[in-house]
């Protein structure tokens, strides 16, 4: 909440005060400003009716200039369990060093067709201007907003605990535990040194905010022998690193069971949603600071990838149901940043330490995979195309080995085969990153055919792409090849994803030229069968892995929709003979049984009030209704009772089979993207 005024009442934020609206005094921004889209303007002024003296007006010797009042941030977080900060006071802008100009980074990576291609390196060095000549103004109000964000570090132990619990589910391959642990360690020390034994915490946080701005515009100078601790001592106190912290903690609330968030004493939904809102606003604010400063750094690319994952969980991946395109917009920013950093080409930076080069590879793979999954889900052209990139496979090493001392690191490298895979058969090292890159390449091949408007030679292209997909899948090491006797859900997930790419190719062939219906149905049935097999294995173990649940919704629902549509079509008395293939009998009984089990599992594992729950439940009801029609056909002659069968939730014989078939064929079976690398 805001700092109290002299009369003891809480101050309103500036937008609410000027609009004469009731402010709820929430931090870092009030909820009313969030709803009105004025979160950027939401600040708390200690003396709103006072004005600073205009600089252009000459001062008389007999009068003393009044000091300009800085903006006061809110003192506490939204939920009651977190303690309040100490009362805040003001600080004069004179303490801000050079508030008008600060340096920012250059344009970044230049390719062979850029203007630099016409000059030699020595000529470019002559005309290159030092970064200190390039500057951008910093508004003192931005410093005050930064202090508001830094107030959240008072609750750093909560964010660290959430991060720790997140890594118990699955070791991250883009951002691993050693990276996040070091980030929390440095920030805890920075915050403690800035605020301990201080009677004026806000003044200290203003100074710390200035330090963060100064660090953010300062390039991170590295050397080949640099350690992770040394790197983070320079990189942690920057706004992009704070964005990564809040984005990671907020995303973890979607991956952890609600009871494990440490907020059991609060109302479950309110506490969880409150934490998510604070994290998303703080992460967004930090990225805005970086954008204002023109920052270009490795940590910025990390923060952007994590923020995009967070946005997808919170707002969805499309505008189909929530009218929100922020995830797609963020993907554009990620693409711009990784290209400017040159992550799409082999790393030639001789001053970068080993661990930083490997993190760069994983970041690029994460951006590439995100681009493919989002492009597939939305049916849009991908932004990062393989033909223009030379993306490197990360080494199959754990994060602990990547950041370890040279002796330990070299020993781990010695246990890699010539292709870079570990010879121990461990999937929890770097195998996920490498397999994700292979799967994303295959997905781009499927996209190239599916999004093309050319029909000539389509069947031949589809068969060629299917063969290439199978070869790519079989090129993975044996411990990533799925068989029914393997119980690792992540191995099954990679296998299902390759099958789904074939499913998309067959769907394109069938919808464009009406061929390959048998292969299309069989591929959908194969996907559903493997999914149900994995759910059964996981249920018996007592805990279903998040990857299985995501696959059940993201890949399973479109496949189930295909089976459902074809089942109903072939169950109609007037079904044409052309739809049935005499060589391949239609597995009607098997499809009905597996769809019935699929519906039950979907209803069980779809998380209420999160992500794609509404679309998921809608699809489940549609499949249930189709099964009812197949098993208990409606009387002949029943006509439609509504133009919108879903809004009226028809059951049994509410609408005719013809109308229901048209509705079923036009129903959007696509689910929210699963973002497997976020697990």
Residue spans of the language-model regions?
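Fungal C-terminal regulatory tails
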Residues: 294, 513-679
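Intrinsic, low-complexity transcriptional activation domains
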Residues: 1-253, 258-266, 270, 326, ...
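Short amphipathic alpha-helical segments embedded in low-complexity Lys/Glu-rich regions
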Residues: 28-34, 47-51, 77, 350-356, ...
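Extended, leucine-rich alpha-helical cores of fungal transcription factors
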Residues: 138-152, 165-183, 228-250, 266-392, ...
């Amino acid at each position: 909440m805001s700092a109290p005024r002299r009369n003891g009442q809480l101050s309103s934020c500036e937008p609410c005060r000027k609009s004469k609206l009731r402010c709820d005094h929430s931090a870092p921004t009030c909820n009313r400003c969030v709803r009105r889209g004025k979160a950027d303007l939401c600040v708390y002024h200690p003396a709103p009716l006072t004005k600073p003296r205009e600089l252009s007006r000459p001062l008389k010797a007999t009068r003393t200039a009044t000091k300009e009042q800085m903006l006061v941030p809110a003192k506490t977080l939204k939920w009651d369990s977190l303690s309040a900060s100490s009362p805040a006071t003001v600080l004069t802008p004179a303490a801000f060093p050079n508030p008008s100009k600060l340096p920012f980074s250059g344009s970044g990576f230049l390719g062979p067709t850029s203007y630099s291609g016409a000059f030699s390196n020595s000529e470019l060095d002559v005309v290159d201007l030092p970064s200190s000549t390039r500057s951008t103004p910093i508004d003192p109000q931005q410093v005050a907003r930064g202090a508001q964000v830094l107030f959240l570090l008072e609750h750093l132990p909560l964010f660290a605990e959430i991060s720790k619990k997140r890594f118990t589910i699955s070791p991250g391959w883009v951002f691993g535990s050693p990276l996040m642990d070091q980030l929390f360690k440095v920030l805890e020390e920075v915050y403690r040194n800035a605020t301990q034994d201080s009677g004026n915490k806000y003044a200290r946080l203003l100074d710390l905010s200035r330090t963060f701005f100064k660090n953010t515009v300062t390039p991170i100078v590295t050397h080949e022998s640099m350690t992770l601790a040394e790197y983070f001592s320079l990189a942690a106190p920057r706004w992009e690193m704070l964005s990564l912290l809040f984005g990671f903690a907020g995303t973890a609330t979607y991956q952890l069971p609600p009871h494990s968030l440490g907020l059991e004493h609060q109302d479950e939904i309110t506490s969880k949603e409150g934490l998510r809102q604070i994290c998303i606003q703080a992460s967004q604010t930090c990225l805005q600071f970086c954008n204002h400063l023109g920052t270009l750094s490795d940590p910025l690319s990390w923060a952007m990838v994590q923020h995009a994952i967070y946005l997808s969980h919170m707002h969805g991946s499309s505008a189909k149901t929530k009218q929100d395109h922020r995830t797609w917009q963020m993907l554009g920013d990620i693409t711009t940043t990784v290209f400017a950093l040159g992550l799409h080409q082999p790393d030639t930076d001789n001053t970068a330490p080993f661990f930083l080069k490997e993190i760069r590879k994983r970041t690029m793979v994460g951006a590439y995979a995100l681009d493919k999954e989002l492009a597939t889900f939305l049916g849009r052209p991908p932004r990062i195309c393989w033909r223009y990139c030379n993306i490197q496979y990360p080494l199959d090493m754990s994060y602990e080995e990547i950041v370890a001392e040279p002796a330990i690191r070299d020993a781990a490298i010695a246990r890699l085969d010539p292709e870079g895979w570990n010879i121990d058969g461990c999937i929890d090292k770097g195998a996920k990153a490498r397999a994700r890159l292979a799967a994303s390449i295959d997905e781009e091949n499927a996209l190239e055919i599916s999004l093309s408007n050319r029909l000539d030679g389509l069947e031949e292209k589809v068969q060629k792409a299917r063969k290439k997909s199978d070869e790519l899948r079989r090129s993975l090491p044996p411990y990533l090849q799925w068989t029914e006797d393997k119980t690792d859900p992540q191995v099954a997930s990679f296998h299902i994803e390759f099958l789904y790419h074939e499913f998309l190719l067959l769907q394109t062939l069938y919808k464009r030229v009406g061929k390959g219906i048998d292969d299309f149905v069989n591929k959908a049935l194969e996907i559903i069968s493997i999914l149900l097999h994995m759910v059964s294995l996981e249920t018996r173990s007592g805990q279903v892995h998040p990857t299985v649940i995501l696959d059940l919704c993201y890949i399973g629902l479109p496949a189930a929709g295909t089976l459902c549509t074809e089942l109903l079509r072939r169950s109609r008395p007037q079904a044409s003979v052309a739809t049935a293939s005499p060589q391949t009998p239609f597995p009607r009984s098997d499809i009905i049984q597996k769809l019935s089990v699929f519906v039950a599992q979907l209803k069980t594992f779809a998380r209420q009030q999160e992500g794609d729950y509404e679309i998921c439940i809608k699809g489940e009801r549609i499949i249930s209704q189709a099964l009812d029609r197949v098993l208990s056909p409606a009387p002949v002659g029943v006509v439609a009772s509504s133009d919108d069968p879903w809004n009226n939730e028809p059951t049994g014989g509410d609408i005719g089979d013809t109308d229901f078939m048209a509705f079923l064929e036009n129903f959007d079976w696509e689910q929210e993207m699963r973002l497997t690398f976020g697990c």
